[in-house]
């Protein structure tokens, strides 16, 4: 594996620019509409809108929009040709002006961004309604991932080979740049998750991620299978032993000289999960390329923190393994010893994520951080209880609630879940300290959280985020969220770190 390894292919997003005035040679101007009285649309905006369009031009645009039935309803897209020496207009509805918030603006701009195939240069005044939200929506909504199809293949998505530039007219430069960094972070997480396991496996993943982090001055360290064995990382080794592509542990470190707090990030990095000896059904197993979504989120988050120069020390600990059945695979009935000495009885090899997280969380706890956040596509029970779009957040009460509330505030749905004490009896083993699953079909998400709690150091504020559903969208695109990798919950974690840094 070359030390210079990079992702074999990256997704494409629009180039976002901040301009003081309307550039020349614009293909279209994107405007926003509110729903007015009697369902008649109203142009949304003020100074920026007036800087581009005269009152006469605005009236002509509204007449055209009304003529083709535009109402200004949320996420409604309407196109009209240019009038009064104005470029063609693409209008997106925002609904009621009184009910507009950042998430509605993100979803609307994401929706319109997905509709701009075939355009090369567009300008927009929507930034004056909320620049950060608009940049996020346009950036993430414009994302496309061609994958490894050959150039010029007829199967390529329409417009994917025609780059789009979006010009925001006016706004604060610092806010614009910070929003771009967040977009870049989500895109990196999406690209990592979308990369097939043939190309992203523990060894390559560790090198690719380390190279990405090194570009922004982060300290990197990679432990191979021999070092993992020497240091006693029994969970990572057990899960990865069935594969010919051996496990790795990646450590990334960001330090700020004025920081007073230390945050540990841990992300599940199972680059492909067959279930091991407890083999998964074949249907939809291809989606298991996403089983490293938690690790991708943490890698992207710590890089964004460095780029934003956040005044907080951060260490990301990323266990990476491929869970495969073979003559060398771990088995139900095995007992493994984790980093730090706790032992686990294996009842199901498809509950592997918590085993590698346990090692990583025990190591992260040795650094005595103030906060520990882990993220993982961990349980099917998360999908059953909260669905495809809402993460389950567990942990110490106050910090758990903070992370869940922050997620909702940035538009990444999250809900605080309990860790009932009675589950402790169900994760006890007669032959080890713990068992990796219970004998009950109930409370699977909480039981996994209760298991992980055993590996969190005393006095550490902790949040465990189960993203089994939200990390990978198997349904249709919506708002600024594409099909396949979503990049959740990167924006949540960036905001949590910003809040900690500013205290």
Curated annotation (Swiss-Prot):
Listed InterPro entries: Leucine_aapep/pepB (IPR011356), Macro_dom-like (IPR043472), Peptidase_M17_C (IPR000819), Peptidase_M17_leu_NH2_pept (IPR023042), Peptidase_M17_N (IPR008283)
Active site feature: 280, 354
Protein name (database record): Probable cytosol aminopeptidase
GO BP term, example: proteolysis
Enzyme class, first EC level, given as a word: hydrolase
EC numbers for this chain: 3.4.11.1, 3.4.11.10
Family: Belongs to the peptidase M17 family.
One Gene Ontology term, aspect cellular component: cytoplasm
Record keywords, A-Z: Aminopeptidase, Cytoplasm, Hydrolase, Manganese, Metal-binding, Protease
Subcellular location: Cytoplasm
NCBIfam families on file: PRK00913.1-2 (NF002073)
Molecular functions per Gene Ontology: manganese ion binding; metalloaminopeptidase activity
SUPFAM superfamilies, per the entry: Macro domain-like (SSF52949), Zn-dependent exopeptidases (SSF53187)
Binding site for Mn(2+) 1: 273, 350, 352
Function: Presumably involved in the processing and regular turnover of intracellular proteins. Catalyzes the removal of unsubstituted N-terminal amino acids from various peptides.
The protein's required cofactors: Mn(2+)
Reaction(s) catalysed (UniProt annotation): Release of an N-terminal amino acid, Xaa-|-Yaa-, in which Xaa is preferably Leu, but may be other amino acids including Pro although not Arg or Lys, and Yaa may be Pro. Amino acid amides and methyl esters are also readily hydrolyzed, but rates on arylamides are exceedingly low; Release of an N-terminal amino acid, preferentially leucine, but not glutamic or aspartic acids
Amino acids binding Mn(2+) 2: 268, 273, 291, 352
Cofactor detail note: Binds 2 manganese ions per subunit.
Database matches in HAMAP family: Cytosol_peptidase_M17
Taxonomy, superkingdom: Bacteria
Annotated source species: Corynebacterium efficiens (strain DSM 44549 / YS-314 / AJ 12310 / JCM 11189 / NBRC 100395)
Broad class of where this protein is predominantly found: cytoplasm
């Amino acid at each position: 594996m070359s030390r210079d390894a990079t992702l074999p292919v990256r997704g494409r997003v629009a180039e976002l620019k901040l301009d003081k005035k309307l550039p020349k040679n614009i293909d279209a101007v994107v405007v926003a509409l509110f729903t007015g009285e009697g369902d008649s649309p109203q142009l949304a905006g003020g100074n920026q809108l007036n800087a581009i369009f005269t009152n006469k031009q605005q009236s002509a645009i509204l007449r055209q929009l009304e003529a083709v039935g535009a109402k200004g309803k949320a996420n409604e897209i309407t196109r009209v040709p240019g009038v009064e020496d104005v470029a063609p207009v693409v209008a997106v509805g925002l609904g009621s002006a009184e009910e507009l918030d950042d998430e509605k603006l993100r979803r609307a701009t994401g929706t319109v961004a997905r509709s701009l195939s075939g355009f090369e240069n567009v300008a927009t005044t929507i930034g004056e309604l909320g620049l950060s939200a608009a940049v996020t929506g346009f950036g993430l909504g414009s994302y496309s991932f061609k994958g490894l199809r050959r150039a010029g293949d007829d199967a390529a998505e329409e417009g994917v080979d025609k780059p789009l530039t979006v010009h925001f007219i006016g706004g604060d430069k610092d806010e614009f740049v910070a929003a771009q960094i967040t977009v870049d972070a989500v895109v990196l997480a999406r690209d990592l998750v979308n990369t097939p396991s043939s190309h992203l496996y523990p060894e390559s993943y560790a090198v690719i991620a380390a190279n990405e982090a090194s570009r922004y001055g982060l300290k990197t360290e990679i432990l191979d299978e021999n070092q993992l064995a020497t240091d006693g990382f029994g969970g990572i080794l057990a899960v990865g032993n069935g594969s010919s592509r051996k496990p790795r542990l990646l450590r990334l470190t960001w330090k700020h000289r004025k920081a007073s707090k230390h945050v540990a990030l841990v992300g599940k990095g199972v680059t492909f999960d067959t279930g091991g000896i407890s083999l998964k059904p074949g249907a939809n197993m291809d989606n298991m390329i996403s089983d490293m979504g938690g690790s991708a989120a943490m890698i992207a988050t710590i890089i964004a923190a460095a780029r934003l120069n956040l005044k907080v020390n951060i260490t990301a600990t990323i266990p990476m393994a491929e869970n495969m059945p073979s003559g060398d695979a771990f088995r139900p009935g095995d007992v493994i010893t984790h980093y730090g000495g706790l032992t686990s009885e294996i009842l199901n090899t498809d509950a592997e994520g918590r085993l590698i997280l346990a090692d990583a969380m025990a190591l992260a706890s040795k650094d005595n951080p103030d906060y520990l956040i882990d993220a993982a596509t961990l349980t099917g029970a998360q999908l059953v209880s909260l669905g495809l779009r809402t993460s389950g957040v567990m942990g110490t009460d106050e910090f758990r609630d903070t992370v869940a509330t922050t997620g909702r505030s940035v538009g990444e749905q999250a809900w605080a879940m309990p860790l009932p004490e009675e589950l402790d009896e169900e994760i006890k083993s007669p032959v080890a300290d713990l068992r990796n699953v219970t004998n009950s079909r109930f409370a699977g998400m909480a039981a996994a959280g209760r298991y992980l709690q055993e590996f969190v150091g005393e006095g550490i504020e902790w949040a465990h985020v189960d993203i089994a559903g939200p990390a990978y969208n198997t349904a249709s695109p919506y708002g600024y969220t594409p099909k396949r990798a979503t990049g959740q919950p990167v924006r949540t974690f960036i905001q949590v770190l910003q809040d900690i840094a500013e205290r």
